[in-house]
Amino acid sequence: MAAFKERILGATGLTVGPLGLAASYGAPAEAFEEAFEKGCNYFYFGSGRHRAGMKQAVRNLCAKGRRSRMVIAIQSYARYGVLMEYFFKRNLRSMGLAQADILILGWHNRRPSPKLVARALALKEKGLCRFLGMSGHNRRLFPQMAAAGQFDLFHIRYNAAHRGAEEEAFPHLTGDSRPGIVTYTATRWGQLLNSKKMPPGEPAPAPSDCYRFALSHPAVDVCLCGPRNIDQMREAMPALELGPLGQEDMERMKRIGDYVHSHNRRF
């Protein structure tokens, strides 16, 4: 089975490893630095109180001259342009950066306000970020926003229990100028790893299987991993060498996903 290799993030031209790193769950700097040396170069700095590990990892790697190999994405949930800019710049300073590769407008299930987008595009024009992204749970919105031509990539929820993007988003984000696609919640907040939530007689999949599921879809450039510690980071890494799921394993993941979704409808 072929391993997952680095790829280009949509039309951005950025070279990315297939397994991305999310900051918010508390993993130490060592976990992120170890993953970087194994090809994980997409650093997603979202919300949460447990981001110190990634901040330190970014500082450490930049001090070693690795900045050009890193893709750093900073997300803001602010709905007002002035607040979005304030928090974005504060996050840059916290990591000792003059520029982020990507600014993400976070959790928009409706079109973000024109004023907010204009403020974000102004930051891009000033060189504080190179590309603009958007995240949200309304899958049908992404093709609409792509058609507007203002966003370079999207963060889209996708896992074995939430497969709607296969019909509502991915087929409509294609072509030479397609936006990059980064997926998140690969383990459905851990539910796809919980042996108590499995179909009767079905063992829980390995964490790496959840990341392999997402990365097996040809539309997906990067699948985010949010480790709480270095052990969880290491549990995810086999996905890179194992590569795409075979047909039998893919059907198993879908079967588990359908069961988890039908028995846990909260999300």
What do these predicted ranges mean?
Residues 1-68:
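N-terminal binding-site loop/beta-alpha segment at the start of enzyme catalytic domains
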Residues 2-7, 53-59, 84-90, 138-140, ...:
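Alpha-helical scaffolding within the catalytic cores
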Residues 16-28, 73-83, 196-204:
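Active-site mouth loops of central-metabolism enzymes
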Residues 24-30, 45-55, 77-84, 108-114, ...:
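Acidic-and-aromatic substrate-binding clefts and catalytic sites of carbohydrate-active enzymes
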Residues 55-77, 122-127:
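Alpha-helix-loop-beta-strand connector modules within alpha/beta enzyme cores
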Residues 85-103, 122-126:
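CE4/NodB-like, metal-dependent polysaccharide N-deacetylase domain
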